[in-house]
């Protein structure tokens, strides 16, 4: 099957792992099945189309018949929101489909490369012999000040007041998967609700071809993290508080794998993951530390954005708040036609803050996208500088590193073959900021189980600290999050 695909980027700007970077080529270790996954060129159309119908009745009645008459095959359809994914349509068929009174928008997917990373540093091994800790304030890297993000956001004050989240609150991590066997995450992931929508893609004649759901090592679940990113994000939301403290450590995590070991995915895969999380997985919170910058005026993009908007609005109607990363391209989203998706369609879009040389923890991160029309709040994402000696690892965000990390430069995280050593990575990006907000949402939801999505959003926005220009500003909008205040004002 030809895959009509956009490749989403995970939104990490810097990894402190030996000489690792988010854009490193994928190693043939531990298996060589992915070796051509990065050979699909940016911008190449791959044969799949998203069709957005004017109403939900159109798709289930005449819509499917029309597509078949034009020579297309409906690969996936969501009648409740009027969206279908189609393969096999010619250029003339696309024109005819767009002209139909049944159809609102039609768009060809296309390949996009992930956003590049820049800075690197060193990995750290966790101390051996430590056990899960009920008190996140006792986690090694919180106690020594490395997890500064938990302090500035008021998480540590919330812990001291007894707010740790509850098992009944469920957070879906839409990402590269989760290393559910890492000591920080063991027992926290609901395996029965976890799933993978990530596919392995190879290039054949300049066209992306879907070879099926990304395979795993023997014994691993389909949602195992073969990268590192999803595990890092997940352990920021919740952890066993051994070396790193989780923001809301007692909540339940759901691994929804939508990005492959290349760190990229498709609009269809991400949208399918959202529907799974909000539907059968029954998530209260969705974290998406991923995204793509697209030109709203480019042909077909409107269909992709409208599809994503409908999927997210449907999730919100089911009671799920969707929190996404703004991106790391230093783009002013108030200007021009660039759209950061899915952030700008999400309930809350998150920019990043962080210190340089451990000074001014609330300054704007050098890489973050911004814009008052797009961003809702900011959170600690870590900071980097192009100047030699302009930042230290401690300016970044530390969290767990997957034992299946795929890049050759990340293989230090695979060193614990006997389970004796677990590794942690420093990283910076809006990817790292977003799970702080997801953790805040989970903590508020745990304390207020009946709170609505609107009430949850308002509590997060209106409790944020004004850390930039007085009033709402283009970099943080409502401010940098403060969960201790949010818990006081939440309805």
PLM feature spans:
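Sec-dependent bacterial lipoprotein signal peptides
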Residues: 1-20
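Structural recognition of the beta-strand scaffold that forms the well-ordered cores
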Residues: 50-51, 85, 170-174, 235, ...
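Short, surface-exposed ligand-recognition loops at beta-strand->loop->(often short) alpha-helix junctions
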Residues: 50-59
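Autoinhibitory propeptides
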Residues: 64-146
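Bacterial Sec-dependent N-terminal signal peptides
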Residues: 16-45
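Extracellular S/T/G-rich loop segment that most often corresponds to the catalytic His/Ser-adjacent loop
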Residues: 342-443, 486-488
């Amino acid at each position: 099957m030809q895959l009509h695909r956009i490749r989403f980027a995970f939104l990490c700007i810097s990894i402190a792992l030996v000489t690792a970077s988010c854009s490193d080529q994928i190693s043939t270790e531990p298996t060589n099945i992915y070796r051509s996954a990065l050979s699909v060129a940016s911008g190449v159309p791959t044969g799949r189309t998203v069709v957005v119908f004017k109403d939900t009745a159109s798709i289930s009645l005449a819509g499917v018949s029309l597509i078949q008459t034009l020579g297309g095959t409906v690969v996936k359809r969501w009648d409740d929101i009027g969206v279908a994914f189609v393969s096999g349509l010619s250029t003339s068929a696309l024109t005819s489909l767009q002209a139909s009174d049944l159809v609102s928008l039609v768009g060809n997917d296309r390949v996009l490369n992930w956003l590049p990373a820049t800075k690197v540093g060193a990995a750290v091994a966790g101390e051996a012999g430590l056990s899960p800790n009920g008190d996140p304030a006792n986690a090694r890297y919180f106690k020594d000040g490395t997890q500064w993000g938990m302090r500035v956001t008021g998480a540590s004050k919330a812990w001291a007041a007894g707010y740790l989240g509850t098992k009944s609150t469920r957070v879906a991590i839409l990402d590269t998967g989760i290393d559910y066997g890492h000591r920080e995450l063991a027992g926290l992931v609901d395996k029965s609700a976890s799933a993978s929508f990530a596919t392995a893609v190879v290039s054949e004649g300049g066209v992306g071809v879907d070879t099926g759901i990304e395979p795993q090592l023997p014994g691993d679940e389909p949602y195992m993290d073969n990268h590192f990113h999803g595990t890092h994000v997940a352990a920021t939301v919740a952890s066993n508080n051994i070396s790193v403290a989780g923001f809301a450590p007692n909540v339940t995590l759901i691994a929804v794998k939508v990005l492959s070991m290349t760190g990229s995915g498709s609009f269809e895969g991400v949208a399918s993951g959202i529907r799974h999380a909000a539907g059968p997985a029954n998530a209260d919170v969705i974290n998406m530390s991923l995204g793509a910058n697209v030109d709203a005026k480019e042909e077909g993009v409107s269909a992709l954005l409208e599809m994503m908007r409908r999927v997210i609005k449907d999730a919100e109607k089911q009671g799920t708040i969707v929190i996404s990363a703004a991106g790391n391209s230093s783009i002013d989203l108030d200007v021009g036609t660039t759209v950061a998706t899915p952030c700008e369609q999400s309930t809350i879009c998150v920019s990043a803050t962080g210190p340089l040389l451990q000074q001014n923890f609330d300054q704007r991160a050098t890489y973050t996208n911004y814009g008052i029309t797009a961003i809702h709040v900011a959170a600690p994402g870590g900071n980097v500088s192009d100047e030699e000696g302009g930042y230290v690892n401690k300016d970044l965000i530390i969290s767990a590193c997957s034992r299946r990390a795929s890049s050759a430069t990340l293989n230090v995280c695979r060193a614990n073959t006997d389970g004796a050593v677990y590794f942690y990575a420093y990283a910076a990006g809006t990817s790292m900021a977003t799970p702080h907000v997801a953790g805040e949402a989970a903590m508020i939801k745990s304390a207020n189980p009946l709170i609505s999505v609107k009430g949850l959003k308002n509590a997060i926005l209106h409790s944020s600290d004004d850390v930039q220009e007085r009033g709402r500003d283009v970099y943080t909008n409502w401010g940098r999050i403060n969960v201790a205040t949010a818990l006081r004002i939440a309805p």
